[in-house]
Amino acid sequence: MNSVGKGVIKKDAMALVTGQPVYCDDLAPKDCLIVKLLRSPHAYAKIKSIDTSIAKRIPGIEAVYTYEDVPTSRFTLAGQSYPEPSPYDRRILENVVRYVGDEVAIVAGANEDCVDRALKAIKVDYEVLEPLLDFENSIDNAIVIHEEDDYKCLCEIGNDVKRNIVSSGESVVGDVDAVLKECDVVLERDYHTKANAQAMMETMRSYCYIDTYGRLNCVSSTQIPFHVRRILSNALEIPKSKINVIKPRIGGGFGAKQTACCEIFTAFVTWKLKKPSKIVYTREETFAASNSRHEMKMHVRIGATKDGKIEAIDLYTLSNQGAYGEHGPTTIGLAGHKSLPLYNHVKASRFTYDVVYTNTMRAGAYRGYGATQGQFAVESIINELADELNMDPCEIRFKNMTRENEVLSQYYNEELNACALDRCLEKAMEMIDYKNKPLRRDMGDFVRGLGVSLSMQGSGISGLDVGSVEIKLQDDGFYTLSIGATDMGTGCDTILAQMVAECMDCDVDQVVTSSLDTDHAPYDTGSYASSTTYVTGMAVVKACEKLRNSILEAAAGFFNVDKEDIEFDGKKINTLDHAHEMSLADFADTCFNGGIAKALIASDSHMSPTSPPPFMVGIAEVDVDKLTGEIKVHDYVSVVDCGTVINPNLARVQAEGGIVQGIGMALSEDITYSNEGKMRNRNFLQYKLPTRVDVPSVRVEFESSYEDNGPFGAKSIGEVVINTPTSAIASAIKHAMGVQVRTLPITAEKVLLGKENE
């Protein structure tokens, strides 16, 4: 292949590294209204009264809005295809606040100074209620977080709001209890993953204006422009035809911007006042009043024979949703359906779950989307089982891992067409010289341990999410590709252009990618669920096939021959007998200038009936100081099966970035709350992200498979890369120090205390 598989430089690379004005705040007019939010200091309270009279008299203030001024429809902020699984459990503003940071009032003014003064001048009388902060005690608690009568769910999600249950359910294959009774070895363990912040560089932000036609235009740093349009329509109670959402470049998202946290506030202000307005969340607001990864507790039972054949796995997961239900019913599913299928040969498996409300900040989407948490539990208990049986952790995986052409009973009964998981493990072992290293090595002042983990994810949401594109042959013979997908740093603008170049036999530089707005871009559900390469990529392939056919038909008409007598090699068009020949540039000019009088445009959409999983293996080599318990990741190798790699350079940095995020989740990142429900970690001094000195040698390689349903055999890569570090590092520490830490993050204190307890 000429373009696919090549390390093409990102099309927007120079603009981004030279600081060109491409982000949301760069594009907002300097004289637009500044919007800020008064937030609740209480985790749970009812608003008895709000006095905004003084605030409204401050010079420069345009408006102050409370719950009495906004529409009363309930909606969800989750960026999901309609009908959304997330419950409709919120309003723009309400007379009940459900976490510290919940919105109480909207203030719009000419500048930040007057808006800040107005926020301080608002007087709120609260009836403070006892908050529910412990998600283990949420179900059937006397404290009910959502008591409203107009709460509703569009889908059957096992919801019981009066019991604080957002969602519940189970997936059962075989008789787990009976099989466990027959097993030689049964382990039963509890694991706990904490909430994590996505910590993208660009905070939440948007600005809005009214155009010449009286329509609301929302410019937003979002992964989900088409979903934002629907959310604004629901929240403002206006038709979608009155709304256009524009997506500029995004300074990172990692799932956080799959929830429309801030757009409703500027949209409401602009719609009411008919003036442009913008909101830019502070870093503290983005930490404490947007969304995070779901905190989960997992109870796992596993049974096996003496020789290491796994017979049954039983996984129960409890998920802390926080105050509002965005993404709760869907993240939880991945905790089981993206972990249990890794070991598909079991006689029985069971996945049960509950998602519960608490008076903490809502959880949402974060790279991995529930699979990260579930795989920490399942991969950790696999490692513990190997230790219990005195088996090598790689050996037990080779013995039990899923293989190509199997039907995955806990993965919606999908057939596994492309799987190189076994080859990934073999290559990772070679990369780290695994066979020549013991699991534990005494290095003097520190001990070095090895740990292994497997991972899988999906490629889009099968049977639901859609990617669409439009491609045009322009005069002079170049192509414009219009997409609805959002490039949030992943390089999809470049990757999709590579696919066009491959299909049309041209250079990538001949393809101009346009990522437009909801008025002009073809419909795309958004950049999430690892969907863009796989789903939108297939739309590109289908549209290019149509365009090639249109070129052949137009040329046949122009040369007055049959279409079958035309050849097109990407650069020129000729008849088979070479009696007629024309360069593509001249042919395109002829199309535009009346010789053919036909614009050559093709569009297509794709929705996949399957979601083929990519796979990954990670092996961690970790050093632990004997005296202090200090943990350092010495080396980390990973091998990814994402089908055909479209752009190795971009795929590699995707993997490296995900691994670093996983290392942070394993060792340092932890959102905690005070007894009053206030988040403690609200800036980068308190929330400990891994820095460059914390990041080891991270080595990434690829092991190809070929997915028949993907573009050029490709699968996804965006999310699978974050999942392996937690369990691999935990196992490496266990081998080094003899301490199995089952609650993340793994700190020196936990290791030393665990050693004392041992």
What do these predicted ranges mean?
Residues 145-236, 401-478, 680-701:
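Helix-loop-helix junctions that connect adjacent transmembrane helices in secondary transporters/permeases
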Residues 1-160, 186, 272, 600:
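Flexible, low-hydrophobicity surface segments
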Residues 67-68, 237-242, 272-277, 306, ...:
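C-terminal catalytic domains of large/alpha subunits in multi-subunit enzymes
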Residues 95-96, 239-242, 246-247, 271-282, ...:
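Conserved catalytic cysteine-centered active-site region
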Residues 6, 12-15, 82-83, 87, ...:
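Glycine-rich loop/linker segments at domain edges
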